[in-house]
Amino acid sequence: MIATGLALSVCYPNAGNIAGGGFLVYRTSDGKYGSLDYREKAPLLATKDMYLDSVGNVIPDKSLIGGLAIGVPGTIAGLYEVHKRFGSLSWEELVEPSINLAKKGFVVTKKQNQSFRSKRAEFISVNGKNTFFGRDYEEGDIVVNPIYAKTLELIQKKGKSGFYEGLNAERLVNTVKQKGGIISKQDLLKYSPIWRKPIQFKYKELNITSMSPPSSGGICLGQLFGMIEPYEIGQYDHNSLESIQLIVEAERRSYADRSEYLGDPDFIDVPANLILDSVYLRNRMINFDWNKATLSSEIK
C-alpha cells in the first residue's frame, strides 16, 4: 500500500498523492477489522462562511480552486501510521521506488496524455505557466521530476516530520498563502490521523465492512443495500429499466440523508444506527414507484 501509493504520486497523481488524504479499511489474517481516517482537515483559521459572499451566496469555485480549496494534508501521516502498526519492510525501503521513479522518469501513456491536457489550462491558471504539469507532454515522453524526488528523499530520511516540519513545511505554507490559503505551520504540526471503528452491515448472506464517518461511503452503501434488499433485483437484467429505477431511487434517498445527517463525528452526532435501521429503510422506500421518479420534495 505505502510503496504503491507513493509511486502513484509520481506517475499517476490522479490516484496517488502526498498532499491529500484518504481512508483505510482493513481485515487482518486473523479476522480483525479496523479503519484509519487520514483525510484532509480544515485549517485552524477556517470558518463556516469562508466560501460565501456578504449576502450568504456560495462563491463559485472558491472551495475547488486556489489556496482556500486546500485542506491540511493527511496522506504522509496516514501512511506513516499504517507503517507503524502493520509495516514489515523498513520505511526507507518503501519510499525508495518512488524516488527512483521521480529521478529516472516514467513514460507518458495515451490516457495520461489526455488527462494532463484536459487539466493543463487549469494548472497554469492557478500556478503559472512554469508549473510542472503545465508542460505539454506527449504520449511516449519520459517525465523526470528531480525536485519531487528531493521531497520524497526528505520523507524517506525523516519520516512524517520530513513532510510536516522543516523545509518542506515552510515551502508548503508559503505557497498556499501566496495562493490565498490559510494553512499554517501549526496546522501541519497538529495533524494526526484517527483510528476509527468501521461500519459493518449485511446484504442477504454477505457481511460488508466499510468506512465510517466522516466518510459518507459506508453509510450510503449500507442504506442502498438495505433499501433494495426487499426487492429481487437479480430477476432484472443489468441496466434494465427496472434495475435502474430501483437503484437510482434508492440512491436519491440515501443522498438526501447524506446531506441531512452525515458529517464529521468529531463535531456532530451522526445517527448511524437510526438511518441504517431496516424499519427506517423500508419506510424510506414506502413512496417508491416503479413507473415514475419520486418528487424531490417527497424525498427530503
Predicted features, each with a name:
Residues Q223:
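Protein kinase glycine-rich loop
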Residues I219:
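Flexible, polar/acidic helix-loop-strand segments at domain edges
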Residues K84-L89, K157-K160, I228-Q235, R258-L262:
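Short helix-capping/linker segments at secondary-structure and domain boundaries
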Residues P230-K300:
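Internal maturation/activation junctions in enzymes
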Residues I2-E165, E170-S216, L276, N283-K292:
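Noncatalytic scaffold domains of N-terminal-nucleophile
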